[in-house]
From Swiss-Prot:
Protein name in the entry: Cold shock-like protein CspA
Source taxonomy: Bacteria, Pseudomonadati, Pseudomonadota, Alphaproteobacteria, Rickettsiales
Domain annotation CSD: ranges: 7-67
Organism the protein comes from: Rickettsia typhi (strain ATCC VR-144 / Wilmington)
Gene Ontology CC entries for this record: cytosol
UniProt keyword list: Activator, Cytoplasm, DNA-binding, Transcription, Transcription regulation
Entry keyword annotation includes rRNA processing: no
GO MF, one example: DNA binding
Keyword Cytoplasm part of the UniProt annotation: yes
Compartment(s) of residence: Cytoplasm
A Pfam family per the record: CSD
Top-level taxon of the source organism: Bacteria
Length: 70
């Protein structure tokens, strides 16, 4: 698991409850689900919002967890 990754919200669809975060280090975009946002005490994410997060791999896919606003 990669930790303390810095990135910006690429987009977030509050109707579908998911979106993607661009990593500042140039890595692949990371999926973010509403559950990770709620676990961080947030209601939603805004495009280009700066965040810090960890990446968890599940079944070959990267998920943002432990989300924090920068």
């Amino acid at each position: 698991m990669a930790t303390n990754i810095v990135g910006k919200v690429k987009w977030y669809n509050s109707t579908k409850n998911f979106g993607f975060i661009e990593q500042d280090n140039g890595g692949k975009d990371v999926f973010v689900h509403k559950s990770a946002i709620e676990a961080a005490g947030l209601h939603s994410l805004k495009e280009r919002q700066e965040v810090i997060f960890d990446i968890e791999e599940k079944q070959g896919k990267a998920y943002a967890i432990n989300l924090r606003v920068k």
